[in-house]
Design a protein with these regions (language model features):
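Glycine-enriched loop-and-adjacent helix/strand subsegments that border the catalytic/binding cleft
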Residues: 63, 69-201
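N-terminal non-catalytic cap/leader segment that marks the start of a structured domain
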Residues: 1-94, 188-190
Length: 201
């Protein structure tokens, strides 16, 4: 799934299919509305051979696949190497913080550095599709719409200016949450709990 110039699309190889067009309007054009139709998305993804591609994929046209999430949570100290780098202890429960949804930006957009104390962290982004409360652990994956990758930018000067640390503020400035380039469904992976990501500068 992709957001191409603010229109929902499916990607295969280097071409895209406009979802509103191939579904005759059954799937909305607006990406945040389109993702509410998970079953239809999978249906059309399975039968793309029946449709003519809308065009070629251009990285410059790709917007954040989930441009306006209702919530945006992060989990701190979620990599062992990062825990060691920070000379911290492994938390007994996940250390959850928020990144304001207003920080979400396109995968190739510029990041506005506010100071020379800005830092980056490559992250796996998990997009929740079907909502719910008190979801049993065994059913958790059924609520995941898909994955993409993102950068968790932080202004460490703001974040650690005083104690307690201001995680939410330091990580939520405009452009500090680029994500994308596509949203990949979990059934594309043999084991969605065993994935690797790489960050290059």
């Amino acid at each position: 799934f992709a957001n191409i110039n603010n229109k929902s699309a499916l990607i295969r190889d280097q071409v895209f299919f406009d979802l509103a067009s191939i579904s005759a309007g059954a799937i909305p054009e607006e990406p945040m509305e389109a993702i509410k139709h998970s079953a239809l998305l999978h249906q059309y993804a399975a039968q793309l051979d029946a449709y003519k591609p809308t065009g070629n994929v251009s990285m410059e046209d790709l917007c954040a696949p989930i441009p306006h999430p209702r919530n945006s949570y992060g989990v701190g100290l979620n990599y062992q190497l990062h825990i060691e780098e920070a000379a911290s202890k492994t938390p007994s429960v996940p250390m959850v913080f928020t990144k304001f949804p207003s920080c979400i930006s396109a995968p190739t957009s510029d990041v506005i550095m506010r100071s020379d104390e800005c830092d980056y962290e490559g992250e796996l982004v998990i997009v929740i599709g079907e909502g719910g409360k008190n979801i049993p652990k065994d059913n958790a994956w059924s609520h995941v719409l898909g994955f993409c990758v993102g950068q968790d930018f932080s202004d460490r000067g703001v974040q650690y200016k005083d104690q307690p640390a201001q995680f939410n503020l330091g990580k939520s400035f405009d452009t500090f949450g680029p994500i994308g380039p596509y949203l990949v469904s979990i059934d594309s992976f043999t084991d969605p709990s065993d994935l690797s990501i790489t960050t290059k500068v």
